Amino acid sequence: MTFESFTVLPAVDMQDGQVVQLVQGERGTERTYGDPVDAATDWVAAGAEALHLVDLDGAFEGARANATAVEDILDATDVSVQVGGGIRSAEDATALLDRGVDRVILGTAAIETPDIVGEIAAAYSDGVLVSLDAKDGEVVVEGWTEGTGMDPVAAAQRYADLGAAGILFTDVDVEGKQEGVRTDPVRDLVDSVDIPVIASGGVATVDDVRALEAAGAAGAVVGTALYEGNFTLADAQAAVED
């Protein structure tokens, strides 16, 4: 998938073998929503064209504890899949891409070793998304627990130059709070790079989805709002097709 049109990606965030949603990325705030494979197949049955999978144990601990669930989702679905969480080396990324993942999401690894982006992109031109998670205007890593001192716009430009196929921007300040999105940070990123920007964090209504599309985002990752039934996936897709 090249995000030629705005795409709504249901989030399948995994922790201890279960689908969860966190508030502002903080452990201990999770709501649990069952089996990851069941969730993924349900979203595909509901019309999802792409899925966003995150191994939260990998993001927090560095070890991909939910790797088997990712494999099972790949076997059970036939849509575009992007995967993040615990991908700390080119070898980790390559193994996932060879297995059939469409895009790997690099966060901490890209910050610590920027050249890894170009290394992977050289072999998989559309295979690397760089995750820029921002809290109080600063890029954060290690499961959103450590600041980097990096400005999101400057970071996005750097990774675009290194060959990233897109930027996954998470606004941690509104993530999981169900209080709406902030479009200014998204628009700033969209205006600064020529690669797709996928937005995550804060979506509570279909109007939020529309707002992200209007801000120029190529897609939106939606989690809590879908799991809590604020609106359906079909509602969100229809909102950006009008």
From Swiss-Prot:
Q: Which GO terms describe its biological process?
A: 'de novo' pyrimidine nucleobase biosynthetic process; L-histidine biosynthetic process
Q: What is its EC number?
A: 5.3.1.16
Q: Coiled-coil regions in this chain?
A: none
- Record-annotated active site: 13, 133
Q: What class of enzyme is it?
A: isomerase
Q: What Gene Ontology molecular function terms does this protein carry?
A: 1-(5-phosphoribosyl)-5-[(5-phosphoribosylamino)methylideneamino]imidazole-4-carboxamide isomerase activity; oxidoreductase activity, acting on the CH-CH group of donors
* CDD domains hit by this protein: HisA (cd04732)
The leader peptide range reads none
Q: Where in the cell is it found?
A: Cytoplasm
User: According to its record, what are the GO cellular component terms?
Assistant: cytoplasm
Catalytic activity line of the entry: 1-(5-phospho-beta-D-ribosyl)-5-[(5-phospho-beta-D-ribosylamino)methylideneamino]imidazole-4-carboxamide = 5-[(5-phospho-1-deoxy-D-ribulos-1-ylimino)methylamino]-1-(5-phospho-beta-D-ribosyl)imidazole-4-carboxamide
**KW Amino-acid biosynthesis (keyword) present:** yes
Enumerate the UniProt keywords alphabetically. Amino-acid biosynthesis, Cytoplasm, Histidine biosynthesis, Isomerase
* Principal subcellular localisation of the protein: cytoplasm
Q: In which pathway does it act?
A: Amino-acid biosynthesis; L-histidine biosynthesis; L-histidine from 5-phospho-alpha-D-ribose 1-diphosphate: step 4/9
What the record says about family reads: Belongs to the HisA/HisF family.
Q: What is this protein called?
A: 1-(5-phosphoribosyl)-5-[(5-phosphoribosylamino)methylideneamino] imidazole-4-carboxamide isomerase
Q: What is the scientific name of the source organism? A: Halobacterium salinarum (strain ATCC 700922 / JCM 11081 / NRC-1)
Gene encoding the protein: hisA
